[in-house]
Design a protein with these regions (language model features):
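Conserved G/P- and acidic residue-centered "switch" motifs that form tight phosphate/ATP-binding loops
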Residues: 9-10, 68, 163, 208, ...
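Gly/Ser/Thr-rich phosphate-binding loop
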Residues: 67-69, 87, 96-99, 109-183, ...
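Conserved AMP-binding/adenylation subdomain of ANL enzymes
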Residues: 25-47, 51-120
């Protein structure tokens, strides 16, 4: 076990997930196969996301560690009174990949539209613009895509991923020809996904070496309900 991370508790009580070295390494191999740029050029990240959340603490920190990259800790964040610090940091550090939640992208896009110095520094080396944690609105996507193309003279990849604490975290990436707002993507390399009827919806279920074996100290009868006979983890997400 590398660490314990708690689920967000947004729909149920938070549960502890034993996150293993295998889960983390499988995730990073998924990412490397999806983003071969990481092998060509060691990634440079500026990141404010908390390490007790799987996006920041497993996904982003792991990208730097696995690929011999660099991660700078951003002491700003996309909230009132804090985002100016992020802007200052981005004028000092040009990331090769920038990862954020949609709220962060909304704030940054507005700043990029107004600040030429920021555009020059931010777009100097960046090859991938990545969001996760929630959906980026179509309007937000289009604004970001427009400012990137205007400044760089070409498209910069805007991508997203679907994941969760229990899978450390990746399950799907927006690869392939269809990349747009609202699209959750295709299964990550090594991840199997099936959709199971659940009422009038479909439940998202996953299987792979990146999936936890079970929650920490959850009763056996409760553990048995989260995995089916084929070994798929039932996420409870539609």
């Amino acid at each position: 076990i590398a660490k314990f991370l708690f689920t967000s508790g947004s729909t149920k009580l938070p549960k502890a997930v034993p996150t293993t070295h295998l889960m983390l390494c499988v995730n990073q191999q998924m990412l490397l196969q999806t983003f071969p740029e990481f092998e060509e050029t060691p990634p440079v990240l500026l990141d404010w996301l908390s390490w007790h959340h799987t996006f920041g603490g497993s996904h982003n920190v792991g990208i730097a560690l696995y690929n011999g990259g660099t991660i700078y800790i951003d002491d700003g964040k996309p909230v009132a009174g804090k985002f100016d610090e992020t802007i200052r940091n981005l004028k000092e550090i040009s990331p090769t990949v920038y990862l954020n939640v949609p709220k962060g992208w909304e704030e940054l896009t507005e700043a990029l539209e107004k600040d030429e110095e920021l555009r020059d520094r931010f777009f100097a080396k960046v090859k991938i613009l990545f969001f996760a944690g929630a959906a980026l609105s179509e309007a937000g996507w289009n604004r970001l895509d427009k400012i990137a193309q205007q400044h760089c003279g070409e498209k910069i990849r805007i991508m997203s991923g679907l994941g969760m604490t229990e899978t450390a975290p990746s399950c799907a990436f927006t690869t392939g020809p269809r990349v747009m707002a609202g699209f959750i993507g295709y299964p990550a390399p090594g991840c199997e996904i099936k959709l199971v009827p659940c009422g009038d919806k479909l439940e998202f279920c996953v299987r792979g070496k990146h999936v936890m074996k079970g929650y920490w100290r959850l009763k056996a009868d409760q553990q048995s309900t989260i995995f089916d006979d084929e070994g798929f983890f039932h996420t409870g997400d539609a």
